[in-house]
From Swiss-Prot:
UniProt GO MF annotations: ATP binding; metal ion binding; NAD binding; NAD+ kinase activity
UniProt keyword DNA damage present: no
Protein name (Swiss-Prot/TrEMBL): NAD kinase
GO CC annotations on file: cytoplasm
Binding site for NAD(+): 70-71, 139-140, 167, 169, 177, 180-185, 236
Catalytic residues as annotated in Swiss-Prot or TrEMBL: 70 (proton acceptor)
A Pfam family assignment: NAD_kinase_C
HAMAP family: NAD_kinase
GO biological process, one term: NADP biosynthetic process
Length: 284
């Protein structure tokens, strides 16, 4: 085994004991740590999204094993993004679009990792800035209303050139990797996960002429709302956006890195997860 492969961080999001997955996760954590040891890996556990607190541990790891669903993987990817570390998901729970393996396939995956028979996927990530506060997004950045009533006006610019005003509940700015998440629920297009582009999808726009827009990732975008709004990152973190305050979004210089099995096929995953070609009554 190469030296750089010897340390794997295990990331588990904190789970309340009343969560139906709590007991399963607790048992899985112990089993995973024992399996890593048996396969010759050093390991450590992180159960916090505070990357600064765990900076030394993060720097030490070759990769991160994310135990849970897509939400767990997204949290880990954001936390480790600035450290340029790859992650791989071991699915526990319902959603597993990003997961590399099920729990019962982890041993084979680790053996393939030791033999360099795993592929590294690099995906576009977003870098956002509000004032002096910067952040990364893996799936999407959403500009949303703070108030339940009324319409939010969002002006959109490419560089300094205005190109649209969205009037509705908000706007999704998604990555190709995130195009099958909130963007898809809002009737945005599916864009191949390895594409270099942004997807702008309006939320319940007041105008019937507004449609989702796909832009090349070479553009720098900025947005401002006519009243106070919320900026939501991957459905997990929020920032306040003051009225007429600019939100700057561009392609992150660092990619999102996911380890996947060599046999993984993007179109097969789409077909299985979205039940393409199946009867509507078929259960997942």
């Amino acid at each position: 085994m190469k030296d750089s492969y010897q340390t794997i961080g295990v990331f588990v999001r904190p789970t309340h004991y009343q969560n139906p997955l709590f007991e399963e996760l607790e048992q899985a954590k112990e089993w995973v740590l024992k399996l890593l040891e048996d396969e010759g890996f050093e390991s450590f556990m992180i159960d916090s999204l505070d990357g600064a607190k765990d900076a030394r541990l993060i720097e030490k790891a070759y990769a991160f094993l994310c135990l849970g669903g897509d939400g767990t993987i997204l949290g880990a990817l954001r936390m480790t993004h600035s450290y340029n570390k790859p992650c791989f998901g071991v699915r526990i729970g319902n959603l597993g679009f990003l997961s590399a393996v099920e729990l019962n396939g982890l041993k084979d995956f680790l053996q393939d990792l030791k033999q360099n028979r795993i592929k590294l996927e690099e995906h576009l990530a977003l870098e956002g800035r509000i004032g002096k506060t910067s952040f990364y997004a893996i799936n999407e950045i959403v500009i949303a209303k703070k108030k339940a009533l009324g319409v939010l006006d969002i002006k959109a610019y490419v560089g300094h050139t205005p190109f649209n005003t969205y009037k509705g509940d908000g706007l999704i700015i998604a990555t190709p990797l995130g195009s099958t998440a909130y963007n898809l629920s809002a009737h945005g297009p599916i864009v191949h996960a390895l594409s270099q582009s942004y997807i702008l999808t309006p939320l319940c726009d007041f105008s019937l002429t507004q449609r989702p827009l796909v832009l090349g990732a070479e553009f720098c975008l900025n947005f401002c709302a006519h009243e106070d709004a919320l900026v939501v990152i991957d459905g997990q973190a929020t920032y306040d956006l003051k009225a007429n305050q600019p939100l700057y979004i561009q392609k992150s210089p660092t990619t999102t890195k996911l380890l996947q099995k060599n046999s993984r096929d993007y179109f097969k995953v789409l077909k299985e997860k979205l039940l393409w070609g199946e009867s509507p009554s078929k259960k997942r």
